[in-house]
Amino acid sequence: MRAVIQKTVGAKVDVVSEAGTETCGKIDGGFVVLLGVTHSDTEKDARYIADKIAHLRVFEDEAGKLNLSLKDVGGAVLLVSQFTLYADAASGRRPSFSQAAPAEQAQQLYLRTAELLRGHGIHVETGRFRTHMQVSLCNDGPVTILLDSFMTRISPKMKVVPD
């Protein structure tokens, strides 16, 4: 599971259709998280990503150090599904998305990640799965962090959330 986490002072996601544009998620401050799911992802990956999002210390404390977490500052998450995080553009000019999980599996783990974040006491807004969306945000910092739960399988230094 991959997550691109962007610290924001405000963000929204609109669903675009023939009927028009509808805002389906909006936050005043916290993280915009673009979330991609691959074939081998499980509940364990969702727990790892949700725990990291809740506890990453990238908000400034009184001394100006990045020492506070999303939970510490009462921030929210705008969670947006993003299968293109598993694009392979190594050869040719058209990326392959074969590493992205099938829609049913991806949606289940996407919703589970949102549920786990809520379990941490975090307010979560979401995009709408399998729709064309427009994400608007104002980056803060900017701070952008890439998480990949696969790294927990190959690096002994990576901390894995217990079962």
From Swiss-Prot:
Chief localisation class: cytoplasm
Catalytic activity, as annotated: glycyl-tRNA(Ala) + H2O = tRNA(Ala) + glycine + H(+); a D-aminoacyl-tRNA + H2O = a tRNA + a D-alpha-amino acid + H(+)
Gene that encodes the chain: dtd
Assigned protein family: Belongs to the DTD family.
Function according to Swiss-Prot or TrEMBL: An aminoacyl-tRNA editing enzyme that deacylates mischarged D-aminoacyl-tRNAs. Also deacylates mischarged glycyl-tRNA(Ala), protecting cells against glycine mischarging by AlaRS. Acts via tRNA-based rather than protein-based catalysis; rejects L-amino acids rather than detecting D-amino acids in the active site. By recycling D-aminoacyl-tRNA to D-amino acids and free tRNA molecules, this enzyme counteracts the toxicity associated with the formation of D-aminoacyl-tRNA entities in vivo and helps enforce protein L-homochirality.
Motif (Gly-cisPro motif, important for rejection of L-amino acids): 141-142
Keywords (A to Z) from UniProt: Cytoplasm, Hydrolase, RNA-binding, tRNA-binding
Top EC group: hydrolase
E.C. number: 3.1.1.96
Extent of the signal sequence: none
Protein name: D-aminoacyl-tRNA deacylase
Assembly with partners or alone: Homodimer.
Keyword Acyltransferase: no
HAMAP family noted in UniProt: Deacylase_Dtd (MF_00518)
